[in-house]
């Protein structure tokens, strides 16, 4: 008897549209037979990783690699806590931010009568993970200016709202919600509702913020802030994210975590990277200059784009973006079309080096002119 394994999972899995990452350089090289490729699709740091992190990796002993990691006893815990001005018991280390979202859903929404709340054009993994667990998710529409109306979030929240997911700044729009609005949201929602503030791009937006969200943790124990070493630190390949929250929340997460969720290499690299302020400042300088370079290029071509507080720009092709996307691929440039977000006319491009940005803008001009 033939078994249709597609029908064995629950309905949430069967109907799931999986997250598809940006095309890799290796994938495009295989498809097109070209070697001169730049990737501006996944908001990675074009400068690579911190030299201090790389040195820490290169000098690791084989014994360190051969032993199981112990994240909670690693010196990174106290060092990161000191850097963030929080207590070690407020930290939870994770194999990337995605695992954080999954474990939060499992702990605070799964097998309850509670739902998840976010907004349209939020980071897609929130809905993907909620749907995979068959947790109802409600999405609040945003305005024509692509900005989130916090009052609408407040009005949509009730006692059955288990978790609110907000990325600030948001991917893929790049929009930043001012801290006064986030504080207002915290003051209005039920104390039993977690606000998960996804700050993956925090370092790129920090200069625009008047308050650090971590300052609210004591007053609002239902706040969970997530950050990552993937973006500004250039460590996306090592998968290290972390949550900062009330110790009681952290304790619950530790009860259900998978064993050895953070590897030894990531721990050593992050421990070193925290000290590399020169690399952080160089990355921010390059990003600011690259942002201005791309904006000037878009303005010259009369291309509309969304204001961004991240390390990428999302722009409007004014028609389905697939033609431009394929043209850029043919020219060895990988960007990110946003059909998965139902933004069919939009493309997201990572801010690259000056040379990478110039190559992208030249290809853009050749396509449109």
From Swiss-Prot:
Cofactor(s) listed: pyridoxal 5'-phosphate
Assembly description: Homodimer.
Name assigned to this protein: Histidinol-phosphate aminotransferase 2
Family that this chain belongs to: Belongs to the class-II pyridoxal-phosphate-dependent aminotransferase family. Histidinol-phosphate aminotransferase subfamily.
Keywords annotated in UniProt: Amino-acid biosynthesis, Aminotransferase, Histidine biosynthesis, Pyridoxal phosphate, Transferase
Alphabetized Pfam families for the sequence: Aminotran_1_2 (PF00155)
Reactions catalysed: L-histidinol phosphate + 2-oxoglutarate = 3-(imidazol-4-yl)-2-oxopropyl phosphate + L-glutamate
Record InterPro entries: Aminotransferase_I/II_large, HisP_aminotrans, HistidinolP_aminotransfase, PyrdxlP-dep_Trfase, PyrdxlP-dep_Trfase_major, PyrdxlP-dep_Trfase_small
Membrane-spanning segments: none
Modified residues (N6-(pyridoxal phosphate)lysine): 231
Disulphide bonds in the chain: none
């Amino acid at each position: 008897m033939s078994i249709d394994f597609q029908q064995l999972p629950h309905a949430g899995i069967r109907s799931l549209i999986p997250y598809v990452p940006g095309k890799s350089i290796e994938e495009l090289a295989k498809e097109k037979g070209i070697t001169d490729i730049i990737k501006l699709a996944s908001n990675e740091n074009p400068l690579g990783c911190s030299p201090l992190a790389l040195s820490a990796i290169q000098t690791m002993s084989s014994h360190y690699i051969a032993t199981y990691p112990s994240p909670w006893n690693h010196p990174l815990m106290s060092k990161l806590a000191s850097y963030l001005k929080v207590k070690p018991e407020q930290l939870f280390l994770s194999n990337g931010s995605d695992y954080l979202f999954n474990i939060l859903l499992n702990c605070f929404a799964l097998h309850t009568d509670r739902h998840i709340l976010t907004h349209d054009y939020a980071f897609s993994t929130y809905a993907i993970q909620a749907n995979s667990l068959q947790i109802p998710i409600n999405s609040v529409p945003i305005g024509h200016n692509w900005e989130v109306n916090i009052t609408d979030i407040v009005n949509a929240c009730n006692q059955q709202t288990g978790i609110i997911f907000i990325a600030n700044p948001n991917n893929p729009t790049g929009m930043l919600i001012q801290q006064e609005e986030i504080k207002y949201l915290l003051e209005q929602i039920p104390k039993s509702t977690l606000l998960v503030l996804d700050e993956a791009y925090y370092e790129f937006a920090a200069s625009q913020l008047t308050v650090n969200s971590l300052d609210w943790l004591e007053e609002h124990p239902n706040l969970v802030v997530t950050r990552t070493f993937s973006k500004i630190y250039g460590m996306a390949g090592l998968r290290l994210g972390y949550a900062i929250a009330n110790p009681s929340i952290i304790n619950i997460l530790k009860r259900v975590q998978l064993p050895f969720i953070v590897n030894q290499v990531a721990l050593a690299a992050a421990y070193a990277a925290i000290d590399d302020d020169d690399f952080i400042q160089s990355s921010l300088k390059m990003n600011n200059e690259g942002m201005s370079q791309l904006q000037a290029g878009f303005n010259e071509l009369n291309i509309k784009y969304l204001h961004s507080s991240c390390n990428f720009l999302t722009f409007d092709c004014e028609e389905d973006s697939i033609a431009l996307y394929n043209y850029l691929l043919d020219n060895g440039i990988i960007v990110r079309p946003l059909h998965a977000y139902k933004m069919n006319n939009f493309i997201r491009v990572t801010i690259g080096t000056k040379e990478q940005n110039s190559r992208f803008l030249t290809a853009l001009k050749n396509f449109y002119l």
